[in-house]
């Protein structure tokens, strides 16, 4: 059977519209979890204020130079802030991926679904999803730090891994290997969707500061919710595409 991107886009749009409230609630819950965890594990405001003390920002040629000019205590605060942001983001993304994929599975099986039921049903696979998303994020970030293009290629090649891990109950590394092989064979169907997702996330990041006009916390929840909705659309597309490829 010939698969066209247009038909998969249409199916994705229909599913997203029909399950919008459930997906919105999952996205909102994941955003709230991300923001709360980030706040809990982040340094205090007083500690963050120390990062600006005695650091010559204008004279620093780059990030590494800036970090080298910091005191050991400031470097520790920066490391804690970075780790808190990364950890909370990974937790939120793992719950989002598990919740959205379980919504698709339950709806496809003709069952009634709610946001809490989908997240609860995804609990057994969350540890593997967390490890998978951590490794994927690490590889993509390393690729982007090198020449940007390798990172984008890795993001495309590993896009199907979460779907395969949940749907076929694969291991972390098995899903990564299988995703690379299957995506490479269907690059014309996967690449445009992932590139559109990256572009949408980048545009959202550029306008994220405008959300802080409300309050930093509410702005962070709103920005994360929109980001989660964008990721949910990609997951729906990839799930539908994967099921068509397997037929």
From Swiss-Prot:
Q: Which GO terms describe its cellular component?
A: plasma membrane
So what family is this one in? Belongs to the UPF0259 family.
Q: How does it sit in the membrane?
A: Multi-pass membrane protein
Q: What is known to happen upon mutating residue 119 to V?
A: In strain: ECOR 60
| This protein's UniProt keywords | Cell inner membrane, Cell membrane, Membrane, Transmembrane, Transmembrane helix
Organism of origin is Escherichia coli (strain K12)
List, alphabetically, the Pfam families matched.
UPF0259 (PF06790)
Signal peptide residues are: none
Report which gene this protein is encoded by: yciC
Query: Can you name this protein?
Result: UPF0259 membrane protein YciC
